[in-house]
Amino acid sequence: MAAEVTETAQPVETAASTDNNREQREPRRGGRERNPNRDRGNRDADKSQFLERVVTINRVSKVVKGGRRFSFTALVVVGDGNGLVGVGYGKAREVPLAISKGVEEAKKNFFRVPRVANTIPHPVQGEAAAGVVLLRPAAAGTGVIAGGPVRAVLECAGIHDVLSKSLGSSNTINIVHATVEALQQLEEPRAVAARRGLDYDRVAPEKLLQIEARAAEAAAAAKKAGAEKVGA
């Protein structure tokens, strides 16, 4: 009598099941799992928060053994339009990447610009190499009287009324850096008064004193109205 042989069916592993088992056994390299639902809104908010101005883009060629190798450089000005501004210089094989690098460098070079009623507190002169830029305060409604490179820096800094003059070199990079050097020389009136040992009223511009007087009157009126409302 022949012996009966019972065969047990073995599970067949498909490629998909093998990949799933492998993912369960082996963690991702780096120890962190990618979250497909992560919030990317912060990037868009960061981009919309700042003003970006591409001042100039240059193409640079390098001769190598196999021929010419091209790359691009971008000079970018970034600011919040409220007294914060920075300048960056990016280099890359593609234009968008060069601009992106310039923006990141500009954010690392941020500095604060003192302002008085949308203009600058006092005249300044900035120099960079052979480029010279003169900046002078202007009355309200004058606008930005400046060329392209200087205008880009001033608008990103939030200065809307100013007179400017560029002398010497017409190189765009020199003009931008001369403008930045001039803005970095600006001082608050209170800092100037403290350094010279003078009264604030003697140093501060008359326009600034008028603005501060109106602000103080408005604050006093609001405080008085609040006190009367509480008493009633």
UniProtKB/Swiss-Prot annotation:
Region (Disordered): 1-47
GO cellular component, one term: small ribosomal subunit
Extent of Polar residues compositional bias: 7-19
Signal peptide: none
All copies of domain S5 DRBM, residue ranges: 50-113
Matches recorded under InterPro entries: Ribosomal_Su5_D2-typ_SF (IPR020568), Ribosomal_uS5 (IPR000851), Ribosomal_uS5_bac-type (IPR005712), Ribosomal_uS5_C (IPR005324), Ribosomal_uS5_N (IPR013810), Ribosomal_uS5_N_CS (IPR018192), Ribsml_uS5_D2-typ_fold_subgr (IPR014721)
GO biological process, one term: translation
Pfam family, one: Ribosomal_S5
Bias (Basic and acidic residues): 20-47
Domain of life: Bacteria
Keyword annotations of the record: Ribonucleoprotein, Ribosomal protein, RNA-binding, rRNA-binding
Recorded GO MF terms: rRNA binding; structural constituent of ribosome
Biological role: With S4 and S12 plays an important role in translational accuracy. Located at the back of the 30S subunit body where it stabilizes the conformation of the head with respect to the body.
Domain notes: The N-terminal domain interacts with the head of the 30S subunit; the C-terminal domain interacts with the body and contacts protein S4. The interaction surface between S4 and S5 is involved in control of translational fidelity.
Matching PANTHER family: MITOCHONDRIAL RIBOSOMAL PROTEIN S5
UniProt xrefs under NCBIfam families: rpsE_bact (TIGR01021)
Entry similarity comment: Belongs to the universal ribosomal protein uS5 family.
Subunit: Part of the 30S ribosomal subunit. Contacts proteins S4 and S8.
Protein name: Small ribosomal subunit protein uS5
Protein's organism: Leifsonia xyli subsp. xyli (strain CTCB07)
Lineage of origin: Bacteria, Bacillati, Actinomycetota, Actinomycetes, Micrococcales
